[in-house]
């Protein structure tokens, strides 16, 4: 009788752990989407400055882009794909529009650190892929700058 009860208890514990793990996975996707949205919001004014010719923001924009891409890479490795990722990102952007600026700044700082840590923990190939993609993105943004020609 106790063996049967022990098996039931073990089965309940396993089911509970599996449900908790599934819930944690969903939460982590939401967290990653929130981070990507926060980093994108932080990067947008820098990208605008770079497009207008201000090269002084290029290094900072590259770091933000690398952090965002690293977080996207982890979400992809965990099975998140485009349709669901886009939906989570849209939701995160909407939520962040109503966040007080200090809370958004804190989220952005935490997410940048998290992205940097993900990149530091990545293997050489993963780091290469993320940094190369980020460099290409920032280069494309910089190339959108059209120098102002003066009439002389």
Q: Predicted segment positions?
A:
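Bacterial N-terminal signal peptides that target proteins for export
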Residues: 2-11
């Amino acid at each position: 009788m106790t063996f049967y009860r022990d098996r039931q208890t073990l089965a309940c514990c396993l089911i509970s752990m599996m449900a908790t793990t599934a819930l944690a996975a969903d939460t982590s996707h939401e967290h990653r989407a929130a981070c990507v949205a926060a980093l994108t919001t932080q990067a947008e004014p820098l990208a605008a400055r770079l497009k207008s010719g201000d090269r002084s923001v290029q290094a900072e924009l590259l770091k933000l882009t690398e952090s965002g891409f690293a977080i996207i890479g982890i979400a992809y490795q965990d099975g998140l794909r485009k349709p669901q990722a886009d939906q989570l990102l849209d939701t995160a952007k909407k939520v962040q529009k109503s966040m007080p600026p200090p809370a958004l700044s804190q989220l952005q700082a935490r997410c940048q650190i998290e992205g940097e840590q993900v990149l530091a923990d990545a293997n050489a190939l993963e780091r290469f892929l993320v940094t190369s993609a980020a460099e290409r993105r920032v280069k494309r943004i910089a190339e959108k700058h059209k120098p102002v020609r003066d009439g002389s």
